[in-house]
Regions:
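Alpha/beta-hydrolase superfamily serine-hydrolase fold, recognizing
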Residues: 2-307
Length: 307
């Protein structure tokens, strides 16, 4: 009842449409691939992550900025360990494939540097800049990783201890990198990457292609097939750690669970860690915390301890 005694109007109930993916209709699927629907504090957490990256640079100093390719965006930031021949963690940022840059994704640098590792954060074109083409992005990221392997010694890194991590669409790229045929496509050892941590990623692009994300991504059969890591587990040779939060969208939770299970079924080493009560963006923020599930997964895989 309202203050004047009149009955409140009953909210209209949305009629459910035909199923598009599993039991979800189009709106439900679109929402399941829109993290902002499930994270009301998203913009605040994103702002904190960006600010924390700035604070880390104030404490550690500016990273080395080196080019891995011919275009201005094809560069990477190196936050250097204090010891020579140190292990390397390459981070691939998220942003729904269309946002974010390396500078705003360095809050975990202090954790890794203090633990004795280099952090390398890749920059690359977003999907808007590539005209909707994910394959171009994939090639840039792959070339960035190859550059790190070939040039590791030049910045005091150990090319035999390269690990990767990523969150959101960066978690998707971790899956792609772990299932790349490095010998065939780039002429480098298939065991170049020693392990990967995929936070809140996507590993089968079919439902993503059916969602509203296809409004800005030009999904092709080639892109869907090539960039769906779960379909290429025969190429997976490194351990993978999968992390997600229970307050993420149902599809992001399912994607992580299904990928970890598929890797284990294929006889490859995989772990699944669940962050109870964390939404998508809060999972990202916790990467900088060495005692969080996400931060610990990265350190443990590299056999490092927080300091």
């Amino acid at each position: 009842m309202t203050a004047n005694g009149l009955a409140q109007p009953t909210p209209a109930v949305r009629a459910k449409g035909p199923p598009v993916w599993l039991d979800m209709d189009q709106k439900e699927l679109d929402d399941a691939y829109d993290q902002f629907v499930y994270a009301p504090n998203a913009r605040q957490v994103i702002a904190r992550c960006h600010r924390n990256s700035e604070l880390v640079r104030e404490r550690l100093g500016a990273p080395k900025r080196l080019a891995y390719g011919p275009t201005p965006i094809e560069a990477l930031d190196i936050y250097s360990a204090k010891t020579e021949n140190a292990p390397i963690n390459i981070f691939v940022h998220g942003g729904a494939w269309r946002a974010e840059v390396a500078a705003g994704n360095a809050s975990q640098a202090e954790m890794l540097v203090n633990a004795g590792a280099h952090l390398v954060v890749l920059d690359f074109n977003n999907v808007i800049e590539t005209g909707g083409d994910l394959m171009t992005m994939a090639n840039q990221i792959q070339r960035g990783v190859v550059w790190v392997y070939k040039n590791a010694k030049s910045f005091g890194g150990d090319p035999e201890r390269i690990y990767i991590s990523g969150h959101s669409s960066g978690g998707h790229w971790v899956g792609v990198l772990l299932t790349t045929d490095w010998q065939k496509d780039f002429g480098v050892p298939p065991t170049m990457i020693k392990g990967g941590v995929a936070g809140s990623g996507m590993f089968d692009l079919k439902p993503v292609r059916l969602s509203a994300r296809s409004n800005y991504i030009k999904f092709t059969n080639e892109a869907e097939e090539t960039l769906s890591a779960q379909r290429h587990l025969d190429k997976l040779v490194a351990p993978v750690a999968v992390v997600y939060g229970t307050a993420e969208t149902p599809e992001f939770q399912r994607q992580s669970r299904d990928f970890a299970a598929a890797v284990q079924t294929a006889g490859r080493p995989a772990s699944l860690s669940v962050m109870e009560g964390y939404n998508h963006f809060e999972v990202w923020e916790q990467l900088a915390n060495p005692y969080s599930v996400f931060g610990r997964a990265v350190l443990n895989q590299m056999k490092l301890r927080p300091t």
